[in-house]
């Protein structure tokens, strides 16, 4: 895909997709192109399975002499870790080597079509060795199906596309903290050694200057006892920690002399009440920190400990050493003594290392667990379960007959992988609303999930923006609501290193000269340098122009620094933001809260009938669309030899022929239409990486989420009060904002206790009109228009056989036919849905569709498409967090119009801008107007001094790019407004103020004040009124209270809450209130009688007693209060009598309310 990172026409003009170039207002030339935006997912998975792409990267790294890539793949690491599995007597062992994947079973399309998982069988070579005889048996063992990642970074599990989100977790390593003591004014210092798996080790210096240790979060004990247990004598401890008073004080209080005593003392405190054996005591400590099976620092933990403590232990040392523990205690007591640095090793050289307490929210201490590692951890869990089974079988099976195959049970491994993909918090149903939604989902970083934080426990500090996020995680794009700050998005240029830390690129600066060398730095490495921003002015040779340059230092502090002190410089102004945020033009003029909404709302944009890329873009549109993978791209250069709506064939230059198959009107996960549209013609010459066909919401290989509409900022009769939006009828008529939505409905024919369900056209008591569109199988035909209640698939379910009368028995005997006792359980179009049938799939168990599940004989899936025009109540938004609901659609003749007669498309309220501080939208409409009309600058005006040569003139409808933090300036926009190309009449409708005279469409009179008019990019969001509007006549009732259910999904009613009751009480509307609280709600007898009266055309009777009153009485009786209901003459009334009457009345009407199920609905008449 990186091949599609099209060449640039010149430094400033970005060429995206096919023949689309954007005229850029950028002042800075990017030294680095945007990297592959899916690398976070694909590279991690490549490492896990060790495929060809991974092998190529390892070879390239070796050729460059780099050692940063691990040699072993993820699966190799895990099988190596578990090998060998030995029995208790160590007489035999089983080991695994060389895991490999065979050819995949089904293609991606087959998996989606038939609801299967896109996977390949995993095999491993298993070797069984009998130590007694020296016999070795080797077999290749099948370890289950292993899900594969598609090229687009997704997984297909049971036919649905899913994404595994990367997790942000605390890195293993050693951490030092200081906390103020509540009673004294001393700082209490503590240290924690946190492994990847295993027990924590904690040290603490208390207010009495005693050094304590906590093993596995248990009771605190003296650190000198712990050191003695590790084999040090008192003399060695004093020599090692000479000059540290706190250790001397601790040693004075310590009466234990020998290693054995120390071990026993620790054992007593960890396992109180147990008998202490010297061997058990030694084994306990060994198992905690020195046994690789129980304790693992992982490479990253070892790297962090080496770096923090100035050690040089090899990265393969995954357990603690005595040296680590001594170094940790030394660091801690040095901090306590107020020292600022100590001498340690870095890269084999002795250097001074700063003594610091750690900030847990710093990105040097938080790392990413990407897909590969998450799956690896899950396989590890499965293998450790399998290990137990293998050990059991080793002891029970006959040693002569054992082979690797008989020992291994792959079920735990398969179950662990299935569990992860099916139910883990980090394996998510992919957001396919539009290409950007999918791309952002794959680049998401989550602090939640197993081993991470929980929403409830996460404080403000974890959620806050940290200086170390710069260039690594976007400070803007995060959800609103309870997850704010816990879920983020990877910054545009960031990448993950082999330890899982996020790196960001910088240009190296040597003595004030900015070189083209690009180094990727982690947050910890960056702390050692002073970094200048990307727009620091440089001269022609690359030196800083100013003597003192604005730069940031450790901790994010910004200051003016002498040029020669600068170590690095940003590669691009958009380095700090994510892809979603970098698509917002004039981001620098928007308040951060609104920019957050803008970035999030772009992901909710619905793909429209005809996509249109923004006139005012940022230059990121092409990168986003191509890397999202929804655009079909030519793999090789060649000539297009054949084109149809669903396939394009290219004759490549090397003689091969490639056919690209396109997806037509598929349903996305979110129910939007996924459709490819060919952009090449037969006979065209096409280069590798160019666009063959556009996907949803893309135009010519550029992201196209909305439409460029003519917007006026003005009030209009109060109809655009409070962010409401007024639209022109033209947008409805021309289908400008229409979108296609596809719903999927399925029905299963199962085996029931009373017989098989059957899909058929022969339905009991159904009129022929309703069957008109069903074929002979009872399935609706493609192309049929359906409305709510129409039958999609005819299905009958057997009823219980009743005793037959003599006549029926005679008829059966004569005609030899069962007068079938079946009920109609057909699939019908739900309430509020309608559309056209565009597809039907039939799966039959007899045809070997084994994925149907037990007891299912047939499954029919029906797809209904509907075209939704824009309508009042739909939600629209711009890219700056400016959102609103359509309140009125005006006839085009009533819309305000420009002096040349052009009516505006949208009227927005100007009061929505100043309070929200998203001024970028105003600059966008001005630049949109300039780009739509074209311009020509004569001479060299002062305001155009920084404009690139190519931007001095442009034809109408030129697409422009204004990159974030480096876009068009206000004075440039004002100047360009004065030099836009005039209309046919020679008029220039808008001047440098950006405002123009508008005329009232109804009267033709000019409005008193000039109005800001221009082109804004407007998105239609997935909050459509058709999905929300809902009405109920009769429907299901709650089982206990007998009140109607709530919500559209349950076909519920509207709640008349206590505030509404107060309103009617205030008006004294007693009868209306009584009706609402009884017969329209939970007066069972009353509502049945009202229904009867309406059916028969009689007067409605008095309401009865509501069910909730009976529930209240039962509640009080359960609290031992004897509550009775008395009639007017003082007689006790049994509420049961009223119930009996209700059942009798219901029976007469043929309504079954005896079961009082959740769906005891009047529909059952």
UniProtKB/Swiss-Prot annotation:
One BP term from GO: DNA-templated transcription
Highest taxon above the source species: Bacteria
Coiled coil start-end: none
Transmembrane segments: none
Alphabetized Pfam families for the sequence: RNA_pol_Rpb2_1 (PF04563), RNA_pol_Rpb2_2 (PF04561), RNA_pol_Rpb2_3 (PF04565), RNA_pol_Rpb2_45 (PF10385), RNA_pol_Rpb2_6 (PF00562), RNA_pol_Rpb2_7 (PF04560)
Enzyme class: transferase
GO CC, alphabetical: DNA-directed RNA polymerase complex
EC number, UniProt record: 2.7.7.6
Catalytic activity: RNA(n) + a ribonucleoside 5'-triphosphate = RNA(n+1) + diphosphate
PROSITE patterns in the record: RNA_POL_BETA
Keyword list, A-Z: DNA-directed RNA polymerase, Nucleotidyltransferase, Transcription, Transferase
Recorded GO MF terms: DNA binding; DNA-directed RNA polymerase activity; ribonucleoside binding
InterPro entries attached to this UniProt entry: DNA-dir_RNA_pol_bsu_ext_1_sf (IPR042107), DNA-dir_RNA_pol_bsu_external_1 (IPR019462), DNA-dir_RNA_pol_su2 (IPR015712), DNA-dir_RNAP_su2_dom (IPR007120), DNA-dir_RNAP_su2_hyb_sf (IPR037033), RNA_pol_bsu_bac (IPR010243), RNA_pol_bsu_CS (IPR007121), RNA_pol_bsu_protrusion (IPR007644)
PANTHER family found in the cross-reference section: DNA-DIRECTED RNA POLYMERASE I SUBUNIT 2
Similarity remark: Belongs to the RNA polymerase beta chain family.
Complexes and interactors: The RNAP catalytic core consists of 2 alpha, 1 beta, 1 beta' and 1 omega subunit. When a sigma factor is associated with the core the holoenzyme is formed, which can initiate transcription.
Its biological purpose: DNA-dependent RNA polymerase catalyzes the transcription of DNA into RNA using the four ribonucleoside triphosphates as substrates.
Protein name per the record: DNA-directed RNA polymerase subunit beta
Species, as recorded: Leifsonia xyli subsp. xyli (strain CTCB07)
Gene: rpoB
């Amino acid at each position: 895909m990186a091949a599609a990172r099209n060449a640039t026409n010149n430094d400033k003009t970005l060429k995206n997709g096919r023949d689309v170039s954007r005229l850029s207002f950028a002042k800075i030339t990017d030294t680095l192109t945007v990297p592959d935006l899916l690398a976070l997912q694909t590279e991690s998975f490549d490492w896990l399975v060790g495929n060809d792409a991974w092998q190529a990267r390892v070879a390239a790294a070796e050729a460059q002499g780099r050692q940063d890539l691990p040699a072993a793949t993820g699966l190799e690491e895990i099988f190596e870790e578990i090998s060998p599995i030995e029995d208790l007597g160590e007489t035999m062992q089983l080991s695994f080597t060389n895991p490999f994947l065979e050819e995949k079973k089904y293609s991606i399309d087959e998996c989606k079509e038939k609801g299967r998982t896109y996977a390949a069988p995993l095999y491993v070579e298993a070797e069984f060795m009998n130590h007694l005889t020296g016999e070795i048996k080797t077999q290749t063992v099948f370890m289950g199906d292993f899900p594969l990642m598609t090229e687009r970074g997704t997984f297909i599990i049971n036919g649905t596309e899913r994404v595994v989100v990367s997790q942000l977790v605390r890195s293993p390593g050693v951490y030092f903290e200081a906390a103020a003591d509540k009673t004294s004014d001393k700082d209490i210092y503590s240290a924690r050694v946190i492994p990847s798996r295993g027990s924590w080790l904690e040290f603490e210096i208390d207010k009495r200057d005693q050094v304590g240790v906590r093993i596995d979060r248990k009771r605190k004990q003296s650190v000198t006892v712990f050191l003695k247990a590790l084999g040090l004598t008192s003399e060695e401890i004093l020599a090692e920690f000479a000059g540290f008073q706190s250790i001397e004080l601790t040693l004075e209080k310590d009466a234990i002399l020998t290693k054995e005593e120390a071990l026993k003392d620790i054992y007593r405190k960890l396992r109180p009440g147990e008998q202490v054996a010297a061997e058990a005591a030694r084994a306990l400590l060994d198992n905690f920190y020195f046994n690789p099976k129980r304790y693992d620092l992982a490479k990253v933990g070892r790297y962090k400990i080496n770096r923090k403590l100035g050690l040089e232990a090899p990265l393969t040392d995954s357990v603690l050493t005595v040296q680590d523990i001594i170094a940790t205690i030394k660091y801690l007591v040095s901090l306590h003594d107020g020292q600022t640095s100590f001498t340690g090793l870095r890269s084999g050289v002795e250097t001074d290392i700063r003594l610091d307490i750690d900030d847990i929210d710093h990105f040097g201490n938080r790392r990413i667990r990407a897909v590969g590692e998450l799956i690896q951890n899950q396989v590890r869990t499965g293998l450790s379960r399998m290990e137990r089974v293998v050990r059991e079988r080793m002891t029970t099976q006959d040693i002569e007959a054992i082979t690797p195959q008989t020992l291994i049970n792959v079920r735990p491994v398969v179950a662990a992988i299935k569990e992860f993909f099916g139910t883990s918090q980090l394996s998510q149903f992919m957001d396919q609303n539009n290409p950007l939604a999918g791309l952002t989902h794959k680049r998401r970083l989550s602090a939640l999930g197993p081993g991470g934080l929980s929403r409830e426990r996460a404080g403000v500090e974890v959620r806050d923006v940290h200086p170390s996020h710069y260039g690594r995680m976007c400070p803007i794009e995060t959800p609103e609501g309870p997850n704010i700050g816990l879920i983020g998005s990877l910054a545009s240029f960031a990448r993950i290193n082999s330890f899982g830390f996020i790196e960001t690129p910088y240009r190296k600066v040597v003595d004030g000269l900015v070189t083209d060398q690009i180094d990727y730095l982690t947050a910890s490495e960056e702390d050692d340098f002073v970094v200048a921003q990307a727009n620091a002015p440089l001269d022609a040779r690359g030196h800083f122009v100013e003597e003192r340059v604005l730069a940031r230092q450790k901790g994010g502090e910004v200051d003016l620094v002498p040029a020669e002190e600068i170590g690095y410089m940003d590669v691009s102004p958009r380095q700090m933001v994510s892809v979603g945020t970098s698509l917002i033009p004039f981001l620098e003029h928007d308040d951060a809260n609104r920019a957050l909404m803008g970035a999030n709302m772009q992901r909710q944009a619905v793909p429209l009938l005809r996509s249109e890329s923004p006139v005012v873009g940022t230059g990121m549109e092409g990168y986003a669309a191509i890397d999202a993978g929804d655009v079909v791209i030519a793999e090789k250069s060649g000539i297009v030899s054949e084109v149809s709506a669903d396939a394009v064939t290219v004759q490549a230059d090397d003689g091969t022929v490639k056919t690209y198959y396109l997806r037509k009107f598929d349903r996305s996960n979110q129910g939007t239409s996924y459709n490819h549209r060919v952009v090449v013609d037969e006979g065209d010459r096409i280069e590798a990486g160019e666009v063959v066909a556009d996907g949803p919401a893309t135009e010519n290989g550029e992201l196209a989420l909305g439409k460029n509409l003519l917007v006026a900022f003005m009030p209009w009769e109060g109809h655009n009060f409070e962010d409401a939006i007024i639209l022109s009828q033209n947008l409805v008529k021309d289908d400008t904002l229409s979108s296609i939505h596809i719903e999927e409905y399925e029905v299963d024919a199962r085996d029931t206790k009373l017989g098989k369900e059957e899909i058929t056209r022969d339905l009991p008591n159904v009129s022929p009109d309703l069957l008109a569109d069903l074929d002979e199988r009872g399935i609706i035909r493609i192309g049929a228009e359906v409305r709510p209640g129409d039958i999609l698939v005819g299905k009958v379910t057997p009823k219980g056989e009743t005793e037959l009368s003599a006549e029926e028995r005679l008829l059966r005997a004569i005609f030899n036919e069962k007068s079938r006792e079946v009920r109609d359980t057909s699939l019908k179009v739900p309430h509020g849905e309608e559309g056209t049938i565009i597809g039907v799939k039939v799966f039959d168990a007899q045809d070997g569709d084994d994925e149907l599940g037990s007891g299912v004989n047939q499954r029919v899936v029906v797809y209904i498409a509907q075209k939704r025009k824009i309508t009042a109540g739909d939600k629209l938004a711009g890219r700056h967090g400016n959102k609103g609901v359509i309140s009125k659609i005006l006839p085009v003749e009533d819309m305000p119009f420009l002096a040349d007669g052009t009516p505006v498309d949208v009227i927005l309220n100007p009061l929505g801008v100043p309070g929200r501080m998203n001024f970028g939208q105003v600059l966008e409409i001005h630049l949109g107007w300039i780009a739509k009309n074209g311009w020509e600058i004569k001479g060299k005006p002062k305001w155009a001094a920084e404009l690139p040569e190519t931007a001095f003139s442009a034809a109408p409808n030129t697409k422009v790019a204004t990159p974030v933090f480096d876009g068009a300036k206000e004075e440039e926009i004002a100047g360009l407004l004065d030099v836009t190309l005039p209309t046919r009449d020679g008029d220039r409708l808008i001047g440098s103020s950006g405002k123009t005279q508008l005329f009232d469409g109804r009267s033709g009179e000019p409005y008193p004040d000039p109005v800001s008019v221009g082109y804004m990019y407007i998105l239609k969001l997935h909050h459509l009124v058709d999905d929300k509007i809902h009405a109920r006549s009769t429907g299901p009732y709650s089982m206990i209270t007998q009140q109607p259910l709530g919500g559209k999904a349950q076909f519920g009613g509207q709640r008349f809450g206590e505030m509404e009751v107060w309103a009617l009480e205030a008006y004294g509307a007693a009868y209306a209130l009584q009706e609402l609280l009884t017969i329209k709600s939970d007066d069972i007898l009353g509502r049945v009688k009202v229904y009867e009266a309406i059916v028969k055309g009689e007067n409605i009777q008095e309401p009865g007693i509501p069910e909730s009153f009976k529930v209240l009485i039962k509640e009080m009786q359960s609290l031992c209060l004897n509550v009775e209901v008395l009639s007017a003459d003082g007689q006790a009334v049994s509420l049961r009598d009223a119930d009996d009457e209700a059942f009798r009345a219901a029976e007469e009407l043929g309504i079954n309310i005896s079961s009082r199920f959740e769906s005891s609905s009047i529909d059952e008449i």
